[in-house]
């Protein structure tokens, strides 16, 4: 594990609390960056901007405000992960950054995403993602429309050892 942490500044993520979290959890390196939506406002949650899987990351670097922060984040991620860039439109309209890689009961990687995200990715992007395991697209339009989030907002990865 790299013990790196990435976060987008927003109403839900403040610099001081982020610094406390980094210290408490003993992260080796932290990246706090500013983002901007197509409406000019900060992106409300990091998991909308990016999804870090075991060997790949889906990220919308187009929404980064500061070029130096963008370069630092992409340089860091590219050392350990295959980077799959998404556009601002894919992030905002299709929830393409809001995906989650899990492991099956056979310890095989599965990338869970909504049908909206699946349909928003290009064939090339889906091909890249599928190199790292099966894709599972689920129909959750009500969650996306009413809740404003997608598949990653509904789950968390917990990789506990078997007892």
Name the predicted role of every residue range.
Residues 1-163:
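The feature marks the mature, well-folded catalytic cores of soluble enzymes
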């Amino acid at each position: 594990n790299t013990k790196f942490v990435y976060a987008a500044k927003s109403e839900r993520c403040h610099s001081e609390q982020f610094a406390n979290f980094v210290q408490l959890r003993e992260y080796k390196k932290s990246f706090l960056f500013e983002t901007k939506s197509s409406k000019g406002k900060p992106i409300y949650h990091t998991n909308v901007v990016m999804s870090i899987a075991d060997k790949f990351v889906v990220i919308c670097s187009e929404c980064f405000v500061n070029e130096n922060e963008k370069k630092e984040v992409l340089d860091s991620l590219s050392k350990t992960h295959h980077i799959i860039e998404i556009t601002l439109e894919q992030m905002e309209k299709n929830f393409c950054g809001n995906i989650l890689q899990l492991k099956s009961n056979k310890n095989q990687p599965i990338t869970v995403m909504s049908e909206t995200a699946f349909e928003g990715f290009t064939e090339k992007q889906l091909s890249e993602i599928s190199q790292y395991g099966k894709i599972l697209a689920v129909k959750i339009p009500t969650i996306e429309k009413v809740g404003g989030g997608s598949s990653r907002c509904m789950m968390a990865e917990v990789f506990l050892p078997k007892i």
